UniProtKB/Swiss-Prot annotation:
Domain Carrier: 2-77
The protein's name in its UniProt record: Acyl carrier protein
Subcellular localization: Cytoplasm
Location of O-(pantetheine 4'-phosphoryl)serine modifications: S37
Pathway entry: Lipid metabolism; fatty acid biosynthesis
One annotated GO biological process: lipid A biosynthetic process
A GO MF label: acyl binding
Cellular compartments per GO CC: cytosol; membrane
Protein source organism: Rhodopseudomonas palustris (strain HaA2)
PTM (free text): 4'-phosphopantetheine is transferred from CoA to a specific serine of apo-ACP by AcpS. This modification is essential for activity because fatty acids are bound in thioester linkage to the sulfhydryl of the prosthetic group.
Family of this protein: Belongs to the acyl carrier protein (ACP) family.
Main location: cytoplasm
Keyword Lipid biosynthesis annotated: yes
């Protein structure tokens, strides 16, 4: 997993309280990790803060899995 992927995983574990081994690229935030819509909004805000970038609403709607978040942030992260 990339350095950005590891940071994404850490945020997901902290915010959703899931076991680290469940946080894999194909894991759906809602279906696999038990997030609700508020959790997903909070995750997006945490990603924005951690990586110093803005995630527009239309992009946030396409970030459904851990891998989606990692790919988006690898392209758009400022830090």
């Amino acid at each position: 997993m990339s350095e950005i992927g590891e940071r994404v995983k850490k945020i997901v574990v902290e915010h959703l309280g899931v076991e680290p081994e469940k946080v894999v690229d194909g894991a759906s935030f809602i279906d696999d990790l038990g997030a609700d819509s508020l959790d997903t909004v909070e995750l997006v805000m945490a990603f924005e803060e951690e990586f110093g970038c803005e995630i527009p609403d239309d992009a946030a709607e396409t970030i459904l899995t851990v891998g989606d978040a990692t790919k988006f942030l690898e392209k758009n992260a400022k830090s």
